[in-house]
Amino acid sequence: WAVKRQKYGEKIWWCDNIGSKYPYPNWYIDEPAINHRIQFWMAFKYKIDAIFSWGANVWGGYKAGENDKWPYQPWNAMTYPGANGDGYQLYPGIDKTPYSSIRLEVIRDGIEDYEYIYILREKLKELKKARKGENMVAATESLLDFSSLITSLVKFTANPEELFRRREMIALQIEKIDKILK
């Protein structure tokens, strides 16, 4: 569907918000961390142009008084029932410094994964254009095939080690291609 719309010049975005619930991966507190990270691999596989998050520091519902907010009052992570943590990826510190959540750090890892994948795809194009390393083309294309990791939008690996291994293999392949292209 996305590719068809993109042929008309449209950009396709995913939005992770209160509506995206199990079995779809999302950024809620009670979901496994791989669900936060796999979305970027899916975006590459399904040719999605962007992932939109409506908020990272939506700390609404708190009184204006200085001592009426967290950490002086209990934190209410249930601002959106059924979507725990939606809009909360940064948390306010006592000194008003924002603190990163583990989820935000996993999301960052997913963004970095996407960058590695993107770089490898671009290196593959260079390799083909230069007509070098023909034996590397198939291996590179195989690394960019995520069918063993993602079979649908709701069926994907639950094992983070598979993503770690694939990312490492992608990084090594980038280095190998760079040596060939020099």
Map each language-model feature to its residues.
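Catalytic-core regions of glycoside hydrolase
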Residues: W1-K63
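Catalytic domains of carbohydrate-active enzymes that cleave complex glycans
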Residues: A64-K182
